[in-house]
């Protein structure tokens, strides 16, 4: 769950920080620094910004099935089987997301979430279905239809759920302290906000 995601990143940072620089090449030092920076940025969104509970965007990227459609890493039948496996896991993921997101959502987040989750619901039986139309295995096509129907229903339910409570007009702003932390932890820019504002 989310706690595991946080703990894994903290442990990875600790493991990287205890490496003896004397044993590292310049390239290794750079890669270690980059790794720590990326993990600190991910921790910011997970914890301080609390996106798993506040922002549907935290989930839409991971749910995007485009890799099975747009990237010909294997033949269509193999990718179709992978898509089916993905689709069969969508209902459980949708339930977890529903449990995590705290309503009401800010208006901008709600619109994004409904467009994303609702868009997936349409995509499964539309463009995704069309992408594998040339696969002649009827049993596989039937399995695809069943899996994507359940996945689409789960995503549409999620889109409806987050809209079941009227959105707030605010709640999306980080505030000065968190914004400063975001810039420092995700962009490695440790500059006072007043100076950043002056720079433009």
Predicted regions and their residues:
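N-terminal maturation segment of proteins
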Residues: 1-199
């Amino acid at each position: 769950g989310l706690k595991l995601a946080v703990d894994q990143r903290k442990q990875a940072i600790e493991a990287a920080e205890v490496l003896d620089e004397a044993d590292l090449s310049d390239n290794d030092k750079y890669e270690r620094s980059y790794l720590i920076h990326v993990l600190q940025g991910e921790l910011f969104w997970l914890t301080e910004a609390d996106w798993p509970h506040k922002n549907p965007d935290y989930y839409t990227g991971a749910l995007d099935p485009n890799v099975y459609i747009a990237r010909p890493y294997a033949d269509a039948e193999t990718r179709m089987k992978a898509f089916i496996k993905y689709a069969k896991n969508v209902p459980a993921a949708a339930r977890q997301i529903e449990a995590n997101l705290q309503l009401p959502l800010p208006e901008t987040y709600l619109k994004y979430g409904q467009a994303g989750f609702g868009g997936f619901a349409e995509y499964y039986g539309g463009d995704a279905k069309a992408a594998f139309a040339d696969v002649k295995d009827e049993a596989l096509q039937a399995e695809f239809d069943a899996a994507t129907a359940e996945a689409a229903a789960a995503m549409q339910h999620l889109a409806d759920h987050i809209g079941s409570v009227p959105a707030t007009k605010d709640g999306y702003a980080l505030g000065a302290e968190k914004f400063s932390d975001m810039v420092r932890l995700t962009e490695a820019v440790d500059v006072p906000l007043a100076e950043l504002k002056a720079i433009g």
